[in-house]
Amino acid sequence: MTHQTHAYHMVNPSPWPLTGALSALLMTSGLIMWFHFNSTILLMLGLTTNMLTMYQWWRDIIRESTFQGHHTPTVQKGLRYGMILFIISEVLFFTGFFWAFYHSSLAPTPELGGCWPPTGIHPLNPLEVPLLNTSVLLASGVSITWAHHSLMEGNRNHMLQALFITIALGVYFTLLQASEYYEAPFTISDGVYGSTFFVATGFHGLHVIIGSTFLIVCFFRQLKFHFTSSHHFGFEAAAWYWHFVDVVWLFLYVSIYWWGS
């Protein structure tokens, strides 16, 4: 390894940003093909490419941070700023969906019957599955905080238990959301109500799946003793992301499920 006189990590050229971008293109194109032509070939190709990219990119980052020691305190500080900016960009992303929802619901057009929910739409009961989903995500927020505190105290077993509980709650939330979609009395094509409901809650569901994947990687890394009480930014970033997903759901629940019904 060459000697360097600074604390920054000079990253080697990597193909994964390109393959990740191509997999995103294949997945979005595949979704359109699935919706309009009932063909899942392109979607499956995109998902496979995405999974391979994730595996190999994570492998490289783990190698650079844990085994080669490139993630110095200075690099970790930069990564923290990067994660904060990423979460801010996600906040703005969801702001667009809330804007669309409130724009449509606060002044419903005569075409919708001048009321919200629009005439003919039977909204979901906010005190049934949505309320259960809310309690599941709030419980997962408690368990991820327990995992973080256990890691800071060097209690490995408690950290693994709490992380496993968080992942299980995340998977349970996803299954509940899928069953709710399956049984919903309206579809994404049912006007502006269906569009705003499924796009906002669907993107949140996608973020829960991403967060769960992030936490599963952290779980396997912890099994291999990758984290210490002073060096665990991978887990910290996952915890921040999970709390963000939690807060977004609270806004979705209050706005779309409770007030919007």
Curated annotation (Swiss-Prot):
Top-level division of the source organism's lineage = Eukaryota
Classification via Pfam families: COX3 (PF00510)
> Is ATP-binding among this UniProt entry's keywords?
no
Report the locations given in the UniProt record: Mitochondrion inner membrane
Reaction catalysis annotation = 4 Fe(II)-[cytochrome c] + O2 + 8 H(+)(in) = 4 Fe(III)-[cytochrome c] + 2 H2O + 4 H(+)(out)
Instruction: Cite the SUPFAM superfamilies for this sequence.
Output: Cytochrome c oxidase subunit III-like
Supply one GO CC term from the record. Answer: mitochondrial inner membrane
Stretches in topological domain Mitochondrial intermembrane: 35-40, 106-128, 184-190, 257-261
Q: Which residues form a coiled coil?
A: none
Q: How does it sit in the membrane?
A: Multi-pass membrane protein
Q: What CDD domains does the annotation carry?
A: Cyt_c_Oxidase_III
User: What UniProt keywords are attached to this protein's entry?
Assistant: Membrane, Mitochondrion, Mitochondrion inner membrane, Translocase, Transmembrane, Transmembrane helix
Q: Name one GO biological process term.
A: mitochondrial electron transport, cytochrome c to oxygen
Picking any one GO molecular function of the record gives: cytochrome-c oxidase activity
What EC number(s) does its UniProt record assign?
Answer: 7.1.1.9
Its transmembrane ranges are 16-34, 41-66, 73-105, 129-152, 156-183, 191-223, 233-256
Positions on the Mitochondrial matrix side per record topology: 1-15, 67-72, 153-155, 224-232
Question: Belongs to which family?
Answer: Belongs to the cytochrome c oxidase subunit 3 family.
- Subunit structure of this chain's protein: Component of the cytochrome c oxidase (complex IV, CIV), a multisubunit enzyme composed of 14 subunits. The complex is composed of a catalytic core of 3 subunits MT-CO1, MT-CO2 and MT-CO3, encoded in the mitochondrial DNA, and 11 supernumerary subunits COX4I, COX5A, COX5B, COX6A, COX6B, COX6C, COX7A, COX7B, COX7C, COX8 and NDUFA4, which are encoded in the nuclear genome.
Summary of the function given for this chain in its UniProt record: Component of the cytochrome c oxidase, the last enzyme in the mitochondrial electron transport chain which drives oxidative phosphorylation. The respiratory chain contains 3 multisubunit complexes succinate dehydrogenase (complex II, CII), ubiquinol-cytochrome c oxidoreductase (cytochrome b-c1 complex, complex III, CIII) and cytochrome c oxidase (complex IV, CIV), that cooperate to transfer electrons derived from NADH and succinate to molecular oxygen, creating an electrochemical gradient over the inner membrane that drives transmembrane transport and the ATP synthase.
Q: Which PANTHER family match?
A: CYTOCHROME C OXIDASE SUBUNIT 3, CYTOCHROME C OXIDASE SUBUNIT III
Instruction: Write down what this protein is called.
Output: Cytochrome c oxidase subunit 3
Name the source organism: Aepyceros melampus (Impala)
